[in-house]
Amino acid sequence: MNKFKYTLAIIKPDILVKQNQNVDKIINKIESKFIIHQRKQIKLSLEEAEQFYKDHRGKFFYERLISFMTRGDIIPLILSDKSLEINNNNNNNNNNTSIKPWRDFIGPTHRDKAREQIGCLRGEYGTSDTRNAFHGSGSEEEAIDEINFFFPHFLENNKK
């Protein structure tokens, strides 16, 4: 049985507001390791941001996160790790997920830890723990929910 191979990534508003010239460079970096299956640029409404981050409601950073995520455009992307395509063709690797490779690629949530990790995107582009430039699904269940949130028909149209 194949594991879920997709993950949801988000390029957050800090990239689009303050570093817009870097978007193409960032997309190229992403495409060096991941296949982009879907992408769009949108601005979340307050209600959409509250729905997307409902699991964080009540946490100390929730209001700051909602305010930040609604201040400008974001780019949600559906990704799969390019190495999965190779591994799936060569053997039955049990690590058939893009979630961990994407989270490793973007690096730790916390800015200072991200800056210590050479080559991670958050270390290069993040400016604070909230304005950390990128989002990555934390689990298969989260990835499914998040992909359905931004791309409601993708998973049903891409069943294998």
Curated annotation (Swiss-Prot):
Its EC number is 2.7.4.6. It is an enzyme of class 2 (transferase). Transmembrane segments: none annotated. Keywords: ATP-binding, Kinase, Magnesium, Metal-binding, Nucleotide metabolism, Nucleotide-binding, Phosphoprotein, Transferase. Coiled coil: none annotated. Signal peptide: none annotated. Pfam families: NDK. It catalyses: a 2'-deoxyribonucleoside 5'-diphosphate + ATP = a 2'-deoxyribonucleoside 5'-triphosphate + ADP; a ribonucleoside 5'-diphosphate + ATP = a ribonucleoside 5'-triphosphate + ADP. Its cofactor is Mg(2+). The active site is at H135. The keyword Magnesium applies. InterPro entries: NDK-like_dom, NDK-like_dom_sf. SMART domains: NDK. One of its GO terms (molecular function) is nucleoside diphosphate kinase activity. GO terms for biological process: nucleotide metabolic process. ATP binds at K12, F61, R103, T109, R122, N132. Belongs to the NDK family. This is Probable nucleoside diphosphate kinase DDB_G0292928.
